[in-house]
Structures are given as structure tokens and as C-alpha cells.
Amino acid sequence: MSTRFPINSTFLESIDKLETGVVWVLKNLPDDAFFTVGQIATDWDGDPKAYGDRRKHPTIAPHDHLGNAGHHGHWWGVVTNTRESSGTPIEQSGKGPDQPYEHYMISATKLVDQRFKENDVRRWTDATTVPYVALPNSRRSMIKIGLKTGCYCLMVNLQSMMYCFGIYADSKAKRGRMGEISKRAVDMLGNQDGSILIVVFPASGQGKGTIPDEQTIQSK
């Protein structure tokens, strides 16, 4: 069961309201950070074994439901042969570091490593190795104060009070929800069930073309 956490808004200003709650900034430091509370949910995007067609390949065991990546004629979460959502998902060859897992699709994320091509799994932010947060797409309130892909964030499990730092590496379509975090972040926070405090630091990070490793992220 999730718990609602009261917030004293004396020194805070609301900049947005999502399905999961209000987004706040400090009144005296409105551009330094924003925060909100959401429900913890696991994001597998970027994981080389996140998605695959089990009807076509019964021996594979994808970590996430294929429907979370799209459907025939409209794929938003995996790389296709045409690089368009209407294309056919590329299946890994199982050969080499670029496509190591045969028959699995190539799961995409918002944050990329520009050194690698789109059909290379190393281009995408792996949910199993990088602690990251997924934010709602195109929220003007967040963009206005400097939110960019790759920004650093702090995540706190409000049940266990365990915390970790992460990056903004994925986006969640049109739904105004917070709390979806990478599998690695879930593991670091120690509990998948409950509420999470997410503090995002706009205009931080290394930018859209670089994926920092976990050690770099936790040193911030």
C-alpha cells in the first residue's frame, strides 16, 4: 500500500500538477531543482533483453511486455528497420557486442551514446546498469526551468529512506506520471513497492550524447 506524504508548502511553489501529484520548486531557488513524489514502477527500456516476440521465438524470455514498446505498425520503444514507428523491429543477431542477444529487439531510450549507431544496443541507456528516471514528455513547466536529457537527479525511497543518484534518460509519452525508474535504480533503492521522492537538477549532466557510468553518477 502506498502512503501519502504531506508537504509543507510555505517555502515552495507549484509549477505543475501530474496524475501522481504536484511538482514543486523552492520559492527562492526556482531554477535550481524541482521535485515531486510518485509511485515506484520499473522501467526496462534500454535493456538489450527488454523486448522480444515470444510467439515468434518461444525460447526467449524478455524482461518486459512487448506491448510497452508498441504494436504492429506503431513501434515507439524499439528500433525498426526504417527508423520509423511504422517499420519492422530489428532483431539482434546474437553476434558481437553491438547485438549480443539473438532474437531480442533493440530497446531505445531518450538518452543515447552518440558514438554508436541506432542498431547497436550500446547506443541506448541500459536500465539494468544505469540508474535513471523517466519523465513525462514535453512538460513546459520542466523545460522552462532548464530540464534537458541527461540531467542528474536524486531518488529517495520514502519507505526505506534508501537513496541513489540518477539521470534523466527516458520519457513516457503523454501520461503525466512520475515514479518510473530503471531496474538498476529499483535495485539500489531496495524496494519496488511504495512511493519515491524524485528531485531533478535542471541544466546539470553531460548532455544528450553521453551516457555516464554508475560511478560517475553516484559521485555527483
State what each model feature region is.
Residues 192-194:
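Short helix-terminating capping/connector loops at secondary-structure junctions
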Residues 174-184:
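Short, solvent-exposed secondary-structure boundary/capping segments
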Residues 1-162, 166, 175-176, 189-190, ...:
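Cell wall/extracellular polymer interaction/catalysis modules
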